[in-house]
Amino acid sequence: MRRAALRLCTLSKGLLAPSRGLTQESQNPENVFHIREVRDKLREIVGASTNWRDHVKAMEERKLLHSFLAKSQKGLPPRTMKDSYIEVFLPLGSQPELREKYLTVQNTVRFGRILEDLDSLGVLICYMHNKIHSAKMSPLSIVTALVDKIDMCKKNLSPEQDIKFSGHVSWVGKTSMEVKMHMFQLHGNDFSPVLDATFVMVARDSENKGPAFVNPLILESPEEEELFQQGELNKGRRVAFSSTSLLKMAPTAEERTTIHEMFLNTLDPKTISFRSRVLPANSVWMENSKLKSLDICHPQERNIFNRIFGGFLMRKAYELGWATACNFGGSRPFIVAVDDIMFQKPVEVGSLLFLSAQVCFTQGNYIQVRVHSEVASLQDKEHMTTNVFHFTFMSEKEVPLVFPRTYGESMLYLDGQRHFKSMSAPVTLKRNYVVEP
């Protein structure tokens, strides 16, 4: 499993390596940012207010940008991958005053903060792709639709070494874009790969009420064509995964056998009854692995469109997931992969955010954690699902098995097993790239 995660990271690295033109763009100052400049640049692009009291006025001004929206994609100039390529530096080593925000008690880097930075970076990359030179502000409202996959190459990050992010648009539909992002950390004189991330972003109109067209993408090399093809494969994989969801289809024969065998293993051998259940040795009931949290969504956590920042939601979910894995495994867990985070509904400022995390699958040293996110307004007590997060952690020691007691928990177990197995089954391309051991 660990080798599989590393393979995914080195595979993506191999894809970008032949396309040296993408990295050459870093010589352009307009494509290089300090981490503090990213959010400021986004506010400038959309004309967002810096004060909460002015947010209504700012949103009213954005309505005037509706005339700049294209009627069709054909009316938009095509862009290249180089047009959207940017680099962002997080100088933890050379600017120690930045460390406090990113520091863990174990003297490593907070991965939740990295998720926030990746979310902001992905949005900025898409605005670079759809840049309108004749307009000061963009008429598009670009938001994160899906975190397709994040794969880690390293277990630990040093808070005393500089970090670099890079990324660009790798696939474009009519109103959506796939963004490839990479993170590196300085070791000696070189930046070593830390993670690869694939996000899917969607473009909305200036009022964030309906879809908007994005600039088409021109492919300039065989490597870029392969990146685009991988985007097509990713889209197909997501459709296939969704169509076979346990919310739509019954488990496979193999999965049904797995659940039945687990059920039989929990029957009390002293009685001949389906009602008497006992927990096998070195095991935990799934219902006992839960942790929950509640947050009030204050204006401080808003995004440039005055909804709650998606990176904040990911950070809170990750931190609860990490705590759940730590509590379950009894030792410090390390994040291995993040996948299939669908942003189903925006979270309004002032909402109550309910997070519920539980271990749904384990194998060896690995813990699959599912975090369910719900919101409720202060006026309306109805809860609505906004996100479901899937995190794969690796513990320092072997962890107990987790056993479901109900049919619903059995489905969560199988869903967790599917997400875990997907880590070792990356999308394969025609060309055979050399994979580091």
From Swiss-Prot:
Protein activity control: Strongly inhibited by NADH and CoA.
Domain (HotDog ACOT-type): residue spans on this chain: 84-207, 287-399
GO molecular function: carboxylic ester hydrolase activity; fatty acyl-CoA hydrolase activity
EC number: 3.1.2.-, 3.1.2.2
Subcellular location(s) of the protein: Mitochondrion; Mitochondrion matrix; Mitochondrion inner membrane
GO BP term (any one): long-chain fatty acid metabolic process
Pathway(s): Lipid metabolism; fatty acid metabolism
CDD domains, A to Z: BFIT_BACH
Catalytic reaction equation(s): butanoyl-CoA + H2O = butanoate + CoA + H(+); propanoyl-CoA + H2O = propanoate + CoA + H(+); hexadecanoyl-CoA + H2O = hexadecanoate + CoA + H(+); octanoyl-CoA + H2O = octanoate + CoA + H(+)
N6-acetyllysine, modified sites: 101
Subcellular location, principal: mitochondrion
Entry GO CC: mitochondrial inner membrane; mitochondrial matrix; mitochondrion
Main enzyme class: hydrolase
Superkingdom as given in the UniProt entry: Eukaryota
Range of the transit peptide: 1-21
UniProt entry keywords in alphabetical sequence: Acetylation, Hydrolase, Membrane, Mitochondrion, Mitochondrion inner membrane, Repeat, Serine esterase, Transit peptide
Functional summary from the UniProt entry: Mitochondrial acyl-CoA thioesterase. Catalyzes the hydrolysis of acyl-CoAs into free fatty acids and coenzyme A (CoA), regulating their respective intracellular levels. Regulates both mitochondrial lipid and amino acid metabolism.
Family statement: Belongs to the acyl coenzyme A hydrolase family.
Complexes and interactors: Interacts with NYAP1, NYAP2 and MYO16.
Entry protein name: Acyl-coenzyme A thioesterase 9, mitochondrial
Gene that encodes the chain: ACOT9
